[in-house]
Amino acid sequence: QLRAFVCRLSSVIFYETMYVGIVLLGLIAFDRFLKIIRPLRNIFLKKTVFAKTVSVFIWSFFFFISLPNMILSNKEATPSSVKKCASLKGPLGLKWHQIVNNISQFIFWTVFVLMLVFYVVIAKKVYDSYRKSKSKDRKNNKKLEGKVFVVVAVFFVCFAPFHFTRVPYTYSQTNNKTDCRLQNQLFIAKETTLFLAATNICMDPLIYIFLCKKFTEKLPCMRGRKTIASSQENQSSQTDNITLG
């Protein structure tokens, strides 16, 4: 029964949230791109209302395409059928599952290509800026690089390995000529990279820390650092005043 629950509900929710995360990362990358390349244009895209509307639309879209995958897994669960989630689906369920799979693959590869384009352009812009500054402010340049590239790092660490593995794995499942040993190896690779995709939940806070100032200011450890830094500055200014006096 637990395995049937995984097939009908939890795995569907997992994949739904994974692709929501992929799309949102793509939008964050697009936001970084606009801020660096066109900082004074497209002001309406930066408004909170617009961001909330897009977020609600994305979650609603993935919910409605995922819901039939839960409903159409309606065959009786037996010890043999739950070994493969597709066995719980009828012909309509299998067809819808394939449609959703194709949509998901299209979304990932679209975001993948766009992210490459965005960050190639951003990297060139950052490099040109770094060269013009003649390394006078190396510390700030390093901070900027960290902030700019954290999104693409999370994307490639969490999501790219799974989708690179999923292509040959899916082919091996649909091709009867594939060697059984190779199928098992690809299955292990797919499950391992799927674990990496699940670690995205741990990587998301890095994006908030690097890119969201309001979030960082609310962290107790960061507030402590800020207090220490400000007290050190006050002590330094007091010392300077005493010395000058």
Curated annotation (Swiss-Prot):
The keyword NADP does not apply. It is found in: Cell membrane. Receptor for ADP. Coupled to G(i)-proteins. May play a role in hematopoiesis and the immune system. Residues 1-9, 57-85, 148-174 are extracellular. The chain crosses the membrane at residues 10-30, 36-56, 86-106, 127-147, 175-195. This is P2Y purinoceptor 13. Gene3D superfamilies: Rhodopsin 7-helix transmembrane proteins (1.20.1070.10). Residues 31-35, 107-126, 196-245 are cytoplasmic. It comes from the Eukaryota. One of its GO terms (cellular component) is plasma membrane. Its main location: membrane. SUPFAM superfamilies: Family A G protein-coupled receptor-like. Disulfide bonds join 7-85. The gene is P2RY13. It holds the Pfam family 7tm_1. It is a multi-pass membrane protein. InterPro entries: GPCR_Rhodpsn (IPR000276), GPCR_Rhodpsn_7TM (IPR017452), P2Y13_rcpt (IPR008109).
